[in-house]
């Protein structure tokens, strides 16, 4: 192939355009973008970029932009590039690895990495030998460029490097990288270590056979003069502990001793990575035996790590700052918490018990087991500036992505995790005396503050062992709420929230009154951080104390109203959460004129002051949702005000959606539009829960049935979840007004019975069940399609408990609609159905489900026979059935007993003894009742 020759006029034109990138003008950048778009029609456009990028006689910013545009083009258009252009880039880019400009070398590394992502090593056979050879060069620039490139390849192409595609390059590469552990250049040592560390999890054979040399190399760098090297030594050891601890076990005592030393390193980055080791090893098998002897040394180190540094104090201690407006970057975006019907939330995740004490903002949490924050990120990634900004994270090799994670937080987390591993008596015998010493009033306030943080950190893991001490600890903490230092008051609020469970129990009940009084005082503190911590702590107390707070309602509401006049934007979000949590736990107790007259006016004032496009309206609507649900009819004429505003918000947001939809991507929606729709739908649901069937009078004068259908046709999981939840509630109270759209609703609901979107699936299933028992004729044509999806879901036994319960209820209700369509398949789901429904609280939903299941089983008793023990277990889960339902199942069970004749006794004796006792008592299965 003839050598490529550029057109000089075209080259000059492109250089001119790239040179404009030095401008700070947005208009100029738009012009650059337009001009570069025109170049895409030139087949060898990327050859020009490559040529400009490698030309060291050009100005650095021109070369830099050429390289970044080339990288972007490879990411987006590589497959469309002519093969000769691809080959030209590969051939010409490698020599630039020795460029004296480090930023140019790093751009080369990113280009190479993206080329391999888009193809493979076998299509560029010269690459790895060239990089390997470069490591033997006398040029420091070439070695650095090659090591940097290899670190990116090891991170992004781990599997490709350990494959035939690369010619098993790791067999040569890993030993050579280990040799760099001894070189004089600290940056080279670091890059070599980082590169190999990416293979620890996959553990290729090339690393396995060199593991002894690798470990010796790591240990040889443990006292490295470079902070960056020591940081990555600690990071590598943490990765080994987390994933391959067996390789460290022969050296584990030395490793632990080293980490004890490194956790106190003068370098904050080294100390932070070392501190992560304690959480990692705490989760390893047999960790108690490994760590037991070191607790007396480790715990003091961790406690010291929890003390605020002077820099922290200067940044955080803002004194009386309640009148200082929040900066926009201080305010987290509000995420609407959309409702998931059922007794279990959609997440079903295990709570580790540790809550970040330095981030008390729970405003995005409705603190409700029935609420699931369904954060559907409709991010419209704007890549307009990607060509001019190297925002790729390819070269982020420092390993620290979360700037907010500190030694203080890591130490507190380790203290927390350790408390759950060791027996309470053993752990507290070491920890409590140290904490008590630090609580002494003679100590500097940062030391006392760290002791209070430690008390909060161990609250859950050492719960039983701490109980005898709480009668002394809690009064101390309540008194400390009045400490002159804001950071002490703040952490005390958090720690008390960790013990609110005990205060709500009989043993701690005497402390409820002083806690409420003092915590309310802190809610209106003059320091914003204290306000935040106190408000969050009070929301936690509300959940634990529940109805015990009823005597304090007036005092609480007066404080909340005072806070409205004092809080800046960020803390208002937390205040809304505390109000909605209170409304949830005390329920209709709020429906008293004297309480309504305190709480509602400030909420109403804000409701009227905010226009429909103001995002500050979103958290307010979330708060009103629960307030309306609890107060209900007591809102009187405000009910129609809230209802009509919600309808208006939905209409406006849908119009904005359709406008956006016509202008941009079909089927997508602005996340802002969907946020308002979700908040308005949820407020309507709160109203319906509060006033019940009275909401029917509002429907005829609105177009809610059609609006709801439009919302259900949107794609966002959050808006679907809220739409389905509202439809379920409307089905309970006034379904007749929605009748004309039932077939459309059911089509959409059926198509969303997929557990990949758990809360959407959950609410769809529940809504179908609510419609089924009220309009069975309309549901009947859909039974077969719904049945198939629900049977599939009920057999996914690892699904969230609430989802399984709702699925079981809806299957049972479909049995009322059309038992003949369900009964032939009873053998496929009855066992899982029984296991799900037996855990459900006795209520009207469970009642209707059992009525439908009775019809299903009666239609096909033989199909259910081999699962009779599960049926009996489910029936026995009732405390008290309705008389007619009891009679039906009494006869059903005795029908099975009679049909089995002489084998019944042998079969029945295989039932668990406790189950037989219940069945004998309630259903007389041990007696002959034949006449």
From Swiss-Prot:
<keyword id="KW-0677">Repeat</keyword>
<dbReference type="GO" id="GO:0005829">
    <property type="term" value="C:cytosol"/>
</dbReference>
<feature type="repeat" description="HEAT 15">
    <location>
        <begin position="704"/>
        <end position="735"/>
    </location>
</feature>
<feature type="repeat" description="HEAT 10">
    <location>
        <begin position="471"/>
        <end position="498"/>
    </location>
</feature>
<dbReference type="InterPro" id="IPR011989">
    <property type="entry name" value="ARM-like"/>
</dbReference>
<feature type="repeat" description="HEAT 9">
    <location>
        <begin position="430"/>
        <end position="459"/>
    </location>
</feature>
<dbReference type="GO" id="GO:0061608">
    <property type="term" value="F:nuclear import signal receptor activity"/>
</dbReference>
<dbReference type="GO" id="GO:0008139">
    <property type="term" value="F:nuclear localization sequence binding"/>
</dbReference>
<dbReference type="InterPro" id="IPR016024">
    <property type="entry name" value="ARM-type_fold"/>
</dbReference>
<dbReference type="Pfam" id="PF13513">
    <property type="entry name" value="HEAT_EZ"/>
</dbReference>
<feature type="repeat" description="HEAT 4">
    <location>
        <begin position="127"/>
        <end position="164"/>
    </location>
</feature>
<feature type="repeat" description="HEAT 14">
    <location>
        <begin position="640"/>
        <end position="693"/>
    </location>
</feature>
<comment type="subunit">
    <text>Forms a complex with an importin alpha subunit.</text>
</comment>
<feature type="repeat" description="HEAT 8">
    <location>
        <begin position="296"/>
        <end position="421"/>
    </location>
</feature>
<keyword id="KW-0813">Transport</keyword>
<keyword id="KW-0963">Cytoplasm</keyword>
<dbReference type="InterPro" id="IPR001494">
    <property type="entry name" value="Importin-beta_N"/>
</dbReference>
<feature type="repeat" description="HEAT 6">
    <location>
        <begin position="214"/>
        <end position="241"/>
    </location>
</feature>
<feature type="repeat" description="HEAT 13">
    <location>
        <begin position="594"/>
        <end position="632"/>
    </location>
</feature>
<feature type="repeat" description="HEAT 2">
    <location>
        <begin position="42"/>
        <end position="79"/>
    </location>
</feature>
<feature type="repeat" description="HEAT 5">
    <location>
        <begin position="171"/>
        <end position="201"/>
    </location>
</feature>
<feature type="repeat" description="HEAT 18">
    <location>
        <begin position="827"/>
        <end position="860"/>
    </location>
</feature>
<dbReference type="GO" id="GO:0031267">
    <property type="term" value="F:small GTPase binding"/>
</dbReference>
<protein>
    <recommendedName>
        <fullName>Transportin</fullName>
    </recommendedName>
</protein>
<dbReference type="GO" id="GO:0006606">
    <property type="term" value="P:protein import into nucleus"/>
</dbReference>
<comment type="function">
    <text>Functions in nuclear protein import via a substrate-importin alpha-beta transport complex that passes though the nuclear pore complexes (NPC). Mediates docking of the substrate-importin complex to distinct nucleoporins.</text>
</comment>
<dbReference type="GO" id="GO:0005634">
    <property type="term" value="C:nucleus"/>
</dbReference>
<keyword id="KW-0539">Nucleus</keyword>
<dbReference type="GO" id="GO:0005737">
    <property type="term" value="C:cytoplasm"/>
</dbReference>
<feature type="repeat" description="HEAT 3">
    <location>
        <begin position="88"/>
        <end position="121"/>
    </location>
</feature>
<feature type="repeat" description="HEAT 19">
    <location>
        <begin position="869"/>
        <end position="900"/>
    </location>
</feature>
<feature type="repeat" description="HEAT 16">
    <location>
        <begin position="743"/>
        <end position="776"/>
    </location>
</feature>
<feature type="region of interest" description="Disordered">
    <location>
        <begin position="317"/>
        <end position="401"/>
    </location>
</feature>
<feature type="compositionally biased region" description="Acidic residues">
    <location>
        <begin position="382"/>
        <end position="401"/>
    </location>
</feature>
<feature type="compositionally biased region" description="Low complexity">
    <location>
        <begin position="358"/>
        <end position="381"/>
    </location>
</feature>
<dbReference type="Pfam" id="PF03810">
    <property type="entry name" value="IBN_N"/>
</dbReference>
<feature type="repeat" description="HEAT 7">
    <location>
        <begin position="253"/>
        <end position="280"/>
    </location>
</feature>
<dbReference type="InterPro" id="IPR040122">
    <property type="entry name" value="Importin_beta"/>
</dbReference>
<feature type="domain" description="Importin N-terminal">
    <location>
        <begin position="32"/>
        <end position="99"/>
    </location>
</feature>
<feature type="repeat" description="HEAT 12">
    <location>
        <begin position="553"/>
        <end position="586"/>
    </location>
</feature>
<feature type="repeat" description="HEAT 17">
    <location>
        <begin position="784"/>
        <end position="819"/>
    </location>
</feature>
<keyword id="KW-0653">Protein transport</keyword>
């Amino acid at each position: 192939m003839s050598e490529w020759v550029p057109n000089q006029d075209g080259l000059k034109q492109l250089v001119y355009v790239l040179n404009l990138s030095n401008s700070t003008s947005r208009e100029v950048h738009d012009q650059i973008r337009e001009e570069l778009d025109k170049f895409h029609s030139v087949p060898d456009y990327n050859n020009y970029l490559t040529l400009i990028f490698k030309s060291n006689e050009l100005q650095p910013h021109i070369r830099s932009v050429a390289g970044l545009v080339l990288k972007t083009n490879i990411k987006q258009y590589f497959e469309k590039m002519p093969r000769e252009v691809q080959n030209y880039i590969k051939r010409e880019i490698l020599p630039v690895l020795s460029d004296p400009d480090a930023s140019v070398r790093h751009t080369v590394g990113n280009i190479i990495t993206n080329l391999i992502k888009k193809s493979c090593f076998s299509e560029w056979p010269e690459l790895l030998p060239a990089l390997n050879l470069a490591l033997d060069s006398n040029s420091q620039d070439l070695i650095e460029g090659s090591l940097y490139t290899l670190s990116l390849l090891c991170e992004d192409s781990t599997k490709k490097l350990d494959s035939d595609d690369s010619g098993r390059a790791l067999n040569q590469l890993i030993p050579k990288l280990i040799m760099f552990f001894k070189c004089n250049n600290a940056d080279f040592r670091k890059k070599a270590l980082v590169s190999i560390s990416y293979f620890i999890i996959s553990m290729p054979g090339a690393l396995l056979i060199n593991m002894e040399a690798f470990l010796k190399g790591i240990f040889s760098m443990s006292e490295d003069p470079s902070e960056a090297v020591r940081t990555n030594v600690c990071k590598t050891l943490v990765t080994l502990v987390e994933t391959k601890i067996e390789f460290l076990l022969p050296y584990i005592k030395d490793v632990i001793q080293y980490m004890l030393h490194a956790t106190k390193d003068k370098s904050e980055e080294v100390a932070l990575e070392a501190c992560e080791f304690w959480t990692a090893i705490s989760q390893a098998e047999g960790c108690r035996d490994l760590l037991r002897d070191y607790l007396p040394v480790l715990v003091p180190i961790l406690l010291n790590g929890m003390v605020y540094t002077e820099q922290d104090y200067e940044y955080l201690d803002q004194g009386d700052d309640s009148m200082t407006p929040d900066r926009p970057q201080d305010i987290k975006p509000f995420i609407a918490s959309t409702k998931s019907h059922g007794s279990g939330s959609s997440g079903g995740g295990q709570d580790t018990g540790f809550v970040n004490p330095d981030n008390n903002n729970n405003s995005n949490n409705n603190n409700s087991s029935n609420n699931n924050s369904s954060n559907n990120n409709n991010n419209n990634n704007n890549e307009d500036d990607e060509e001019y900004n190297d925002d790729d994270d390819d070269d982020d090799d420092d390993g620290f992505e979360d700037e907010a994670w500190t030694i203080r937080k890591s130490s507190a987390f380790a203290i927390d995790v350790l408390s759950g591993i060791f027996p309470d008596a053993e752990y507290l015998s070491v920890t409590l005396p140290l904490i008590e010493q630090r609580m002494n009033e003679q100590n500097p306030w940062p030391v006392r503050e760290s002791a209070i943080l430690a008390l909060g950190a161990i609250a859950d893991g050492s719960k039983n062992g701490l109980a005898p001490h709480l009668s002394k600890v809690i009064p101390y903490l309540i008194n400390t709420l009045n400490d002159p230092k804001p950071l002490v008051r703040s952490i005390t609020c958090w720690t008390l929230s960790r013990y609110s469970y005990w205060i709500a129990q009989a043993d701690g009940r005497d402390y409820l009154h002083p806690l409420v009084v003092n915590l309310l005082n802190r809610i209106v503190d003059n320091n914003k951080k204290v306000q935040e911590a106190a408000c969050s702590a009070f929301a936690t107390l509300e959940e634990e104390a529940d109805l015990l707070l009823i005597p304090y309602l007036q005092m609480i509401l007066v404080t909340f109203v005072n806070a409205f006049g004092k809080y800046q934007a960020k803390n208002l979000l937390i205040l809304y959460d505390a109000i909605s949590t209170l409304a949830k736990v005390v329920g209709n107790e709020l429906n008293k004129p004297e309480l309504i007259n305190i709480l509602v006016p400030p909420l109403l004032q804000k409701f009227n002051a905010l226009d429909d496009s103001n995002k500050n309206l979103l958290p307010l609507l979330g708060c009103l949702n629960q307030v309306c649900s609890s107060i209900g009819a007591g809102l009187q004429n405000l009910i129609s005000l809230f209802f009509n505003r919600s309808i208006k918000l939905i209409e406006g947001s849908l119009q904005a959606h359709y406008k956006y939809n016509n202008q941009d991507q079909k089927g997508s929606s602005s996340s802002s539009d969907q946020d308002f729709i979700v908040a308005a739908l949820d407020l309507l649901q709160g109203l319906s829960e509060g006033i019940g069937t009275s909401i029917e009078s509002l429907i005829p004068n609105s177009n809610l049935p059609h609006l709801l259908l439009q919302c259900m046709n949107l794609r966002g999981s959050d808006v679907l979840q809220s739409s389905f939840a509202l439809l379920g509630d409307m089905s309970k109270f006034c379904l007749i007004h929605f009748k004309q759209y039932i077939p459309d609703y059911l089509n959409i609901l059926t198509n969303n019975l997929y557990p990949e979107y758990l809360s959407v699936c959950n609410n769809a299933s529940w809504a179908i069940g609510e419609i089924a028992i009220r309009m069975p004729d309309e549901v009947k044509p859909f039974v077969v399609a719904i049945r198939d999806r629900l049977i599939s879901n009920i057999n996914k036994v690892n699904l969230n408990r609430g989802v399984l319960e709702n699925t079981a209820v809806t299957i049972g209700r479909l049995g009322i609609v059309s038992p003949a369509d369900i009964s032939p398949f009873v053998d496929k789901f009855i066992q899982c159905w029984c296991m799900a429904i037996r855990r459900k609280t006795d209520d009207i939903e469970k009642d209707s489900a059992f009525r439908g299941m009775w019809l299903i089983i009666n239609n096909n008793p033989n199909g259910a026979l081999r699962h009779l023990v599960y049926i009996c277990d489910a029936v026995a889960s009732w405390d008290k059935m309705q008389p007619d339902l009891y009679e039906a199942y009494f006869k059903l069970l005795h029908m099975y007993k009679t049909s089995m004749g002489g084998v019944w006794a042998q079969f029945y004796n295989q039932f668990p003894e406790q189950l037989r006792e219940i069945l004998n008592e309630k259903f007389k299965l041990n007696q002959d009742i034949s006449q």
